[in-house]
Amino acid sequence: MSNQSNGHELIPSPKRLMKSLRDLGYDFSAAVADIVDNSIEAGATSIAIDVEFDGDDSWVRITDNGKGMEPAQLREAMRYGAERDYDDEDLGRFGLGLKTASLSQCQRLSVASRTNPDRANIAAYCWDMEHIEKTNKWEILPLERTGLGPAIHNPLKEATGTVVLWQKLDRILGFKHPYGEFARKKLTSMCREAEEHLAMVFHRFLAGEVPRRKLKILLNGNSIKPWDPFSRDEPKIKELTPVVIKLEHEGVTGSVKIEPFVLPNQKNYSSAEAFKRASGPAKWNRQQGFYIYRAGRMIQSGGWCRLRTSDEHTKLARVALSFLPALDEAFKINVAKMQVQLPANIRDQIEKAIDPVVKIARKTYDKESPAPAPVASPVTSPPSAPVPYPKASNARQPVVSSPPASYRPAVEPASDNRCTIDEFCSRIEEIAKPDERPVIARVTKRLKSQVGSRGGRT
């Protein structure tokens, strides 16, 4: 019997589709987290994230000590929509994360892997957007072992594992002004945000709460400490009885576990520092609500999923909601694992389950909270190792610089805040959202033409 089809295969244009897939909504922190997911699936127990600032030659590297991949496995992993079977504990879903997350931040993605410490064989390939633009082919480039360079070769000298290297960081630093203090401070700020994000998203792995998956993550050599959104080490924490809800969706049956917590108010925390630490990256009001976990990995931090609105009087209420990847379709998980919807057929049960925690949180706040007092200085949560500042290095090795003991913002004002019109326009374009850029481009073009050759500064 012939397997021939009368259909017409229409292969998408690589350069058009790959450009579009760069805009799925990843920021730097979420993109790094997606690569960490892959490392966890590969059985890694240690993951090192290194960031080097060196202008156009800046790079970001994620290295793990997992089992590594043979050349054929690596080529398949580099494929958009990689074919593989996922089990109930896998963090992956679509076979897109490695590529879409990485190329949302850079123009050149290189991946190298080693499976046997006793053999020198290293498989390495790269996606290069410049090459795709020229050839318009779905074509990865093989990287010869002799030309890998120290950023890729050094971590795999004596161990199994995988190295993911981002170069040509156009979405991180921008093309026009990738040098100088402004670019360095921007990367420093991103490192701080990534540290907070990873400490929160993977806190169950970092604390050893996920069976057989105890994890250590280093950011520029500094160990990331887990941030527990429920302050379970505080003696005055109130942990309500967990609720398990059975869910059936399109023939798939699973369980959704709900664990409600009421955090202590300010005066009942063990210390002022512990209270500030518990406020979270988004601070108290925005951190109330659901913390949704998929296979132990957090995919939502705070918010009530349209069951109720956030309220100052309920800011002490936090609820862990956990499910396995078998229920992904029911929760409508997106590619970037940054959006989730509560299934309509159990929304009423979830609302009933959280009603007690909301009432107790309101009573705790109304009865015991002191009058609000001004906070002396901002504190970023979660606390961890010293801020891993990226710095320029002629030796092409990551350099770690620690801040002073007292907190200071990741980005400090320069002594002269003036900049050229070109620099000003470039900065505006860098922070604009994709749908804003066409309008901003027209405005900045008109601004430059009006300033003309006067070389104005702003």
Residue ranges, per PLM feature:
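Short hinge/gating elements
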Residues: 13-24, 150, 165-187, 276-278, ...
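A short glycine-centered beta->alpha linker in the GHKL/HATPase_c
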Residues: 68-70
